[in-house]
Amino acid sequence: MTESDTKITLIGSRLAREGLEFIFKGEMPECKKCRLKNTCLNLEPGRRYRVERIRSKDIHECFLHDSGVLAVDVSRAPILTTLESRKAVEGAKIMYEPAKCGKRECSVYEVCHPEGLLKGDKCKIVEVLESLDSKCEAGNSLKKVKLAW
């Protein structure tokens, strides 16, 4: 992980621990009047990030977090999802396409439609994990994979 792979942002002091993964939800009404909002809001809404390092123990006041916020380094977190088995090749670079399935009752629906990944994202398959053929209610041949975006 290089310095250019991380961003400095602020996170609630109760949440600030290395390894924490979160989905950045974006600006809240309370943020409009904050002098630190540019640092807080420099992430892409709807994306998954991981806290890599706590930069300082200095707590900054926040209108949203009652215990204040801390400066942290974050990186894009890898995301678990599914791909067609024939496309699941470790190290391959792909353009992400979500599964074409609307079976919300399926046990793997949440994995097939992960939060934080968007159609058309350029990703690298970091790891091919397991076959999900027997779990897919639509009968698709799927593999669970870890993607870096």
Curated annotation (Swiss-Prot):
Q: Which InterPro entries is this protein grouped with?
A: UPF0179 (IPR005369)
Q: Name one Pfam family in it.
A: UPF0179
Q: What sections of the protein cross the membrane? A: none
The coiled-coil regions, if any, are: none
Family, as annotated: Belongs to the UPF0179 family.
Please give the HAMAP family that the UniProt record associates with this protein.
Answer: UPF0179
UniProt-recorded name of the protein:
UPF0179 protein MA_3685
Which species expresses this protein natively?
Methanosarcina acetivorans (strain ATCC 35395 / DSM 2834 / JCM 12185 / C2A)
